[in-house]
């Protein structure tokens, strides 16, 4: 997408998430903006059925896709609502190797459930 702010994010994501092609198993929806030296990303996660602060597998997939399309060879920063994550990798002969996701970890929720 061109802009992650001026978009009806939840409605757009729901139209993809609940599309008949994906509805049975469900999918996460990631929207990404190319910021030249980094990317910005928002995620709608199945199961949560709402926007989340970040998604590790989505961040990694988006960063590697960006790297492949832009011929980047070492690392990509990804800006999410939860903070900035860095994906390090090595691109060798069109294949990614040594892929690492790095960033802060913090509690965002604590709860109890009585049975």
Model-identified regions with their sequence ranges:
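Active-site proximal loop and beta-alpha junction motif in alpha/beta enzyme cores
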Residues: 1-54, 63-115
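Short secondary-structure boundary segments
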Residues: 57
């Amino acid at each position: 997408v061109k802009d992650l702010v001026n978009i009806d994010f939840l409605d757009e994501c729901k139209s993809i998430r609940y599309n008949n092609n994906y509805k049975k198993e469900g999918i996460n929806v990631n929207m990404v903006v190319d910021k030249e030296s980094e990317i910005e990303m928002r995620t709608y996660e199945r199961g949560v059925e709402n926007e989340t602060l970040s998604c590790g597998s989505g961040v990694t997939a988006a960063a590697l896709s960006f790297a492949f399309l832009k011929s980047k060879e070492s690392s990509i920063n990804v800006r999410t609502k939860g903070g900035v994550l860095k994906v390090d990798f090595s691109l060798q002969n069109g294949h990614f190797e040594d892929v690492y996701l790095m960033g802060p970890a913090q509690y965002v929720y604590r709860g109890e459930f009585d049975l």
